[in-house]
């Protein structure tokens, strides 16, 4: 009985890695060994940055809210505290969207926060 060396399995595995490495520069998309290393690293970056993206967006929203709050005479922390005292539960994503796209509505929320801080 002839010996089976698993050539089709190996070829399939290598083709899968080279397919994932499509678009990489130079030997990183041509040579299996280099491509495999780069694909593993790329998957690690992707895993890490899916979590980092959530933090980055939260930072962006807070920066936008803070800028709009200061235009209304409040700091970010005082605005958020005032809204909490007023019982207004609006998340940072929506607040940042209001700050950018609907300044009048954001100003109303800032005024409500000011009133509740002064009580």
Curated annotation (Swiss-Prot):
Family, as annotated: Belongs to the bacterial ribosomal protein bL20 family.
CDD domains: Ribosomal_L20
Gene Ontology molecular functions: rRNA binding; structural constituent of ribosome
One annotated GO biological process: translation
Organism from which the protein derives: Anoxybacillus flavithermus (strain DSM 21510 / WK1)
Pfam families (alphabetical): Ribosomal_L20
Protein name: Large ribosomal subunit protein bL20
Matching InterPro entries: Ribosomal_bL20, RIBOSOMAL_L20_CS, Ribosomal_protein_bL20_C
Gene3D superfamilies: 6.10.160.10, Ribosomal protein L20 (1.10.1900.20)
Gene that encodes it: rplT
One of the record's GO cellular component terms: ribonucleoprotein complex
PANTHER family on file: 39S RIBOSOMAL PROTEIN L20
Keywords assigned: Ribonucleoprotein, Ribosomal protein, RNA-binding, rRNA-binding
Purpose: Binds directly to 23S ribosomal RNA and is necessary for the in vitro assembly process of the 50S ribosomal subunit. It is not involved in the protein synthesizing functions of that subunit.
């Amino acid at each position: 009985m002839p010996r089976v060396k698993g050539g089709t399995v190996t070829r399939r595995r290598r083709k899968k890695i080279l397919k994932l490495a499509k678009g990489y520069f130079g030997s990183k998309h041509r040579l299996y060994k280099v491509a495999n290393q780069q694909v593993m690293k790329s998957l690690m970056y992707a895993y890490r940055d899916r979590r980092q993206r959530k933090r980055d967006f939260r930072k962006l929203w807070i920066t936008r809210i803070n800028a709009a709050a200061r235009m209304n005479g409040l700091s970010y922390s005082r605005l958020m505290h005032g809204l909490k005292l007023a019982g207004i539960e609006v998340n940072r994503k929506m607040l940042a969207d209001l700050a950018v796209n609907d300044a009048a509505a954001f100003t109303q929320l800032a005024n409500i926060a000011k009133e509740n801080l002064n009580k």
